[in-house]
Amino acid sequence: MRFFLLLCFFLPCFQAINLGLKVLELCTTGSCISQSASCVTGDIVNVTQVDRTHVVMCADFRHIKYTDVGRTFRIKFSDVTCSWENTSPADVVFPGNHILQFTVLGVCFDNKVVGGCQNINEPCPEPHTVFHLQREDITLLELCVQAAGFNAQDVGVKYDFSLRHKNCLRYKRTLPPHEVVDEDY
């Protein structure tokens, strides 16, 4: 029994961060382009990009660990390439390519065996957005997020990333405009 508990506790240490995004809406000055798709899983978040456009998306971060608190990850991607790197929260994201940069500020979890919180007390730089998310045994996930490059062509598109691989985009799929619920997110 003790071996099983240790295995359940340490197994997440070998899993990489996974991130699912579904772009629901993009708003520029005075106009919005949106799709009626909903979030089956994940949280609806509103991100202000560096060019001051707003992107509404479903965000689903998985396999965040205590050791990720204080770390900053930058995902840079296009239709054919994707890469990620560790960076600093002070590094500036410039308009152009698709970029999603996030710093893990805190995580709390309770899996009915062990639980607790780990966090850092650092403010988000001005252009960043703070996310407060929940997922299964994670009772609070606080992230400082900055984005660039999302545009009208991204509305209705699902992205799935894994930081296990340097080519981090696992798949991209455009949803039909009428799709309200999708089961495979």
From Swiss-Prot:
It comes from the Viruses. GO terms for biological process: symbiont-mediated perturbation of host cell cycle G0/G1 transition checkpoint; symbiont-mediated perturbation of host cell cycle progression. Keywords: G0/G1 host cell cycle checkpoint dysregulation by virus, Host-virus interaction, Modulation of host cell cycle by virus, Signal. The keyword Signal applies. Residues 1-16 form the signal peptide. This is Non-structural protein 7a. The lineage of its organism: Viruses, Riboviria, Orthornavirae, Pisuviricota, Pisoniviricetes.
